[in-house]
Amino acid sequence: MFEGAMPALITPFTKDDRIDREGLQRNIEFVEEGGVAGIVPCGTTGESATLSALEHEEVIDIAVECSKVPVIAGTGSNNTGEALQFTKHAADAGVDGVLLISPYYNKPNPAGLLTHFKKIAEAVDVPMVMYNIPSRTGQDMPLEVIVELAKVENIVGIKEASGNIGKVSQILENTIDEDFVVISGEDNLTLPILSVGGQGVISVAANIVPDRMSRMVNAALAGDYETARKIHFEIAPLIRALFLETNPIPVKKAAELAGLASGNLRLPLAPLSETNTQKVADELRKLGVIE
C-alpha cells in the first residue's frame, strides 16, 4: 500500500471558493489512469492549512468515495487534539492510511514529538505515515525520535522531505528490523531515495505527469535504474519549474494549463507570476502535456 508513486493531490475550488467536487473526481480519475499507486488528499499541496475542518472532511470523503486506489489522507496539525479529530474522521471514512506532519510552529521537544504521535496511534487503529519536512515545520525530526516511533505497531513509515539523503539512509539502517517504509517527499530526490531503499514518493509532479512518475518509480523498484534515470532526467526540468514559487502555486497553474480542475489559490497564497507561468508552460510543452 505504501509503495509506488502517489500524488499529493491539489484541491480544486469553484469560482465561489468552494470545494470543486466534480473537479476533484476528474483529477483523481486522471492520475489513476496514469497508473499511480495511491492518492494523498489534504496535504501541503492540497492547501490543507487553509481548509476549514468541514472542508478537510469533505475532501477526504470525496477521495474515498471515488478512488479506485488506496487513499492516504493528510490528517496532521500542530494541535494534537485537532490531528486526532482529523485522523478519527479519516479512519471512519474508510481511508487506507493517514499522513501526519510533524507539528509545525510549536517546535516541540523530543518528548513532545513522541507523545504527539503515540497518542494518535494509540487512539486510532489506522496505518500512519509520519511526515518530516523541516522547511515547513521549522524543525527536523531527530533520528532517535523517528527510530523510536517506528517501533509503534501502526506507525508504518515516514515521508522524508528533509533533503538529507544521509539521514534517509540512517533511518532505513536503523529500522531494518521493523516493518517500516521511507517514502520520498521531494520529487527531485525521489530516485536517490529509492536507490538507498525508499519505497515510493508522495509527489507534486504526479498531479501533472502521473504516468511518467509512476513508470520512474516502478522501474527503480524493479531494479531497472537505467530506465528510471532516463525518466528522472526527462521530468527534472518540470519538477524544478513546479517549485519556482511556493508549492502549490506552480502546480495549480500547471493543472489549469493542462486542462485539469484547479481554481483559485486560497489566500495568503497568490497566483503564479507571469514570468514563471511562461516557464511552467514551456516545460509542459516540452513533455507534450500541452501544445
From Swiss-Prot:
The record marks T44, Y105 as: Part of a proton relay during catalysis. PANTHER family: 4-HYDROXY-2-OXOGLUTARATE ALDOLASE, MITOCHONDRIAL, DIHYDRODIPICOLINATE SYNTHASE. It catalyses: L-aspartate 4-semialdehyde + pyruvate = (2S,4S)-4-hydroxy-2,3,4,5-tetrahydrodipicolinate + H2O + H(+). GO terms for molecular function: 2-dehydro-3-deoxy-phosphogluconate aldolase activity; 4-hydroxy-tetrahydrodipicolinate synthase activity. SUPFAM superfamilies: Aldolase (SSF51569). GO terms for cellular component: cytoplasm. CDD domains: DHDPS (cd00950). One of its GO terms (biological process) is lysine biosynthetic process via diaminopimelate. Pyruvate binds at T45, I202. This is 4-hydroxy-tetrahydrodipicolinate synthase. Keywords: Amino-acid biosynthesis, Cytoplasm, Diaminopimelate biosynthesis, Lyase, Lysine biosynthesis, Schiff base. Belongs to the DapA family. It is found in: Cytoplasm. Pathway: Amino-acid biosynthesis; L-lysine biosynthesis via DAP pathway; (S)-tetrahydrodipicolinate from L-aspartate: step 3/4. It comes from Methanosarcina barkeri (strain Fusaro / DSM 804). Its main location: cytoplasm. The gene is dapA. Homotetramer; dimer of dimers. HAMAP family: DapA. Its EC number is 4.3.3.7. PROSITE patterns: DHDPS_1, DHDPS_2. It holds the Pfam family DHDPS. Transmembrane segments: none annotated. It is an enzyme of class 4 (lyase). The active site is at Y131, K159. NCBIfam families: dapA. Catalyzes the condensation of (S)-aspartate-beta-semialdehyde [(S)-ASA] and pyruvate to 4-hydroxy-tetrahydrodipicolinate (HTPA).
